[in-house]
C-alpha cells in the first residue's frame, strides 16, 4: 500500500478517535451526575449533617449517657427536619470550632456563637434566635470590680473565645486592660477556678453564668461588658445558598410553632433570681442529708426521675422528716392530712411513707394533666397541681387560652399563674383565688434544685469512673483525654 494512503488512514483514525472523545466529553458534561450538586443535596445524599458544637452547660453535654443541651437539641431538630442523621462534633473552644468550620470539616457550627463583624467576614450566619450579654465574673466575698480599665487581678479567658474577642475590642478603649488566655481550659473550668479563688475573673455569657451558679454559688456577676449580642448558627461562605436557605426556612417554622420558645424555657426559663445562701445551703445538704434518703427516692420514683422527686422533697421540707407547717402539712413531702389518707399514708412523719405518698400523689397529677400537653412538660403542670391543686392549675390553663396564649405551653401558663391572685381575674375562673405566683416560684425552685442534683450526680459518676481508671493503673492522665477525643473526631471526619 502506498505510503500516502497509510498516512491518510492513520490521520482519519486520529480524527475519528478525537471525534469519539469529544462526543463522550460532551455527553458527560450533559449528564446529571457530572453537574455539581448543591450543598444541601450533598448532605441529603450522604444521609448526615455534620454539626460542630462546644462542650458546656448550655450547648452540649452528656448526662446519664444521653446527649443534652440547647444547641444540640436544636441541631437534632434540624437534622430530623431534613430527614438525615445528626453527626455531632463536640470540641472545647470556639477557636477549635472556627478552625474546623474554616477547613470545611463541618456543615455548620451551633454553639451559642455570637455574631460579630469580624466573624461575618469569615462565615455566613443564619437568623439570630436569642441574645446574650457577656459578664465579668468574680468570686463572692472579693471586692466588686468597678472599672474594667482599672482591674486589680488577673482576667483569664479561653483562647479564641468570644470573651477574648470582646476584651480585644475593649482594650481599644481601655489601654490598661490586661488579660491572659488559656488553651487547656474551657469556660466551665475557668468558672470553677474563679469559684475556688485560683483566678480573679473570667468572662462568660449571662446564660452560662446563670446555670453555673447553681453548682458554684460563689460565682458573682461583676459587670456587664456588652448588651444584647446576637447568637446564630455559622456556616462556610459559599456561592451556593441551598443550606442557608434551608436554615432560614427551618428557623421560620420553628419560631412560628413555638419550638424555639419551648427550648428556651427548658434550658433557661428557671435560672433567674439566683440566691447565694439558698444555693450554698442546698449543695451542703445534698452532700450531708440526701445520701440518707437517696434509696427511698430511687425506690418510689416510678414515673419521674428520682432526683426530681428528691428536689420536690427539698422544696417542701429541706429533707426534714419532721417538718411541719402552720397550714397543717407535714413530713418529707409536706402532705395534707386528706391527701395522706387518700394515698394510704398512716404516718406523715415517717420518711418512707411520706416519700411513697408524695410520689403516688404526683403520679396521679401527671395522669390527670391533659393529653394535649407535651410529655416533657407535663411534670411542670403536675407540680403546679401538687402545690395549689388540680382545679387551680386548670383555671390557669383556661385563663391562658382566654388571653390568646397556648394553654399547653408551660412558658405561657407560668406567666398567667400570678393572675389567679388578682381579683380582676380570679373572679372569672371556676375555682377562684389561688397563690399562682407562689406556684410559679415553687416549680422554678424545684427545677433549679433538680438541675443541681443532676450536676452533682454526674460529677459523682465522673469521679467514680476516674477511680476505676486509677484502679486499672491507667498510664494516661485524665488531662490527656481531651485532645485525644478531639483528634479522633477530626480524624474520623477527615477520613470521610
Swiss-Prot record:
GO biological process: cell wall macromolecule catabolic process; cell wall organization; peptidoglycan catabolic process
Tagged with keyword Ribonucleoprotein: no
Active-site residues (renumbered): 316
Domain of life: Bacteria
Residues in the signal sequence: 1-31
Recorded coiled-coil stretches: none
SMART domains the UniProt entry points to: PBPb
Region (Non-LT domain): 32-271
SUPFAM superfamilies assigned: Lysozyme-like, Periplasmic binding protein-like II
Protein name (database record): Membrane-bound lytic murein transglycosylase F
Annotated gene: mltF
Amino acid at each position: 500500500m502506498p505510503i500516502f494512503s497509510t498516512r491518510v488512514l492513520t490521520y482519519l483514525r486520529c480524527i475519528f478517535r478525537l471525534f469519539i472523545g469529544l462526543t463522550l466529553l460532551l455527553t458527560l458534561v450533559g449528564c446529571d451526575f457530572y453537574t455539581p450538586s448543591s450543598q444541601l443535596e450533598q448532605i441529603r445524599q450522604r444521609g448526615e449533617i455534620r454539626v460542630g458544637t462546644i462542650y458546656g452547660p448550655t450547648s452540649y453535654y452528656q448526662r446519664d449517657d444521653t446527649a443534652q443541651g440547647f444547641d444540640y437539641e436544636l441541631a437534632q431538630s434540624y437534622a430530623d427536619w431534613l430527614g438525615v442523621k445528626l453527626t455531632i462534633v463536640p470540641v472545647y473552644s470556639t477557636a477549635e470550632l472556627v478552625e474546623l468550620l474554616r477547613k470545611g470539616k463541618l456543615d455548620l457550627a451551633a454553639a451559642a456563637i455570637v455574631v460579630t463583624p469580624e466573624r461575618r467576614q469569615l462565615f455566613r450566619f443564619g437568623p439570630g434566635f436569642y441574645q446574650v450579654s457577656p459578664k465579668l465574673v468574680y468570686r463572692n466575698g472579693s471586692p466588686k470590680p468597678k472599672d474594667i480599665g482599672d482591674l486589680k487581678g488577673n482576667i483569664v479567658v479561653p483562647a479564641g473565645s468570644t470573651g477574648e474577642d470582646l476584651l480585644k475590642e475593649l482594650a481599644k478603649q481601655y489601654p490598661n486592660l490586661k488579660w491572659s488566655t488559656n488553651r487547656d481550659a474551657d469556660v466551665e473550668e475557668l468558672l470553677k477556678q474563679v469559684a475556688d479563688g485560683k483566678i480573679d475573673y473570667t468572662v462568660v455569657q449571662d446564660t452560662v453564668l446563670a446555670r453555673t451558679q447553681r453548682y458554684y454559688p460563689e460565682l458573682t456577676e461583676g459587670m456587664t461588658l456588652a448588651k444584647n449580642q446576637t447568637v446564630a448558627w455559622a456556616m462556610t461562605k459559599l456561592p451556593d445558598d441551598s443550606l442557608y436557605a434551608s436554615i432560614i426556612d427551618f428557623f421560620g417554622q420553628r419560631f412560628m410553632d413555638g419550638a424555639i420558645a419551648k427550648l428556651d424555657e427548658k434550658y433557661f426559663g428557671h435560672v433567674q433570681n439566683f440566691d447565694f445562701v439558698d444555693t450554698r445551703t442546698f449543695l451542703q445538704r445534698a452532700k450531708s442529708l440526701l445520701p440518707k434518703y437517696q434509696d427511698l427516692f430511687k425506690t418510689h420514683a416510678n414515673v419521674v426521675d428520682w432526683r426530681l422527686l428528691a428536689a420536690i422533697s427539698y422544696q417542701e421540707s429541706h429533707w426534714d422528716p419532721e417538718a411541719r407547717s402552720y397550714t397543717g402539712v407535714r413530713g418529707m413531702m409536706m402532705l395534707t392530712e386528706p391527701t395522706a389518707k387518700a394515698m394510704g399514708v398512716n404516718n406523715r412523719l415517717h420518711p418512707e411513707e411520706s416519700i411513697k405518698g408524695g410520689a403516688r400523689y404526683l403520679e396521679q397529677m401527671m395522669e390527670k394533666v391533659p393529653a394535649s400537653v407535651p410529655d416533657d412538660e407535663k411534670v411542670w403542670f403536675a407540680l403546679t397541681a401538687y402545690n395549689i391543686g388540680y382545679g387551680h392549675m386548670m383555671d390557669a390553663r383556661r385563663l391562658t387560652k382566654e388571653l390568646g396564649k397556648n394553654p399547653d405551653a408551660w412558658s405561657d401558663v407560668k406567666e398567667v399563674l400570678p393572675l389567679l391572685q388578682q381579683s380582676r381575674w380570679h373572679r372569672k375562673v371556676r375555682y377562684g383565688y389561688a397563690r399562682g405566683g407562689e406556684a410559679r416560684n415553687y416549680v422554678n425552685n424545684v427545677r433549679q434544685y433538680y438541675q443541681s442534683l443532676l450536676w452533682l450526680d454526674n460529677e459523682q459518676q465522673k469521679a467514680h469512673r476516674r477511680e476505676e481508671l486509677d484502679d486499672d493503673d491507667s498510664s494516661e492522665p485524665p488531662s490527656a483525654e481531651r485532645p485525644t477525643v478531639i483528634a479522633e473526631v477530626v480524624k474520623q471526619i477527615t477520613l470521610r
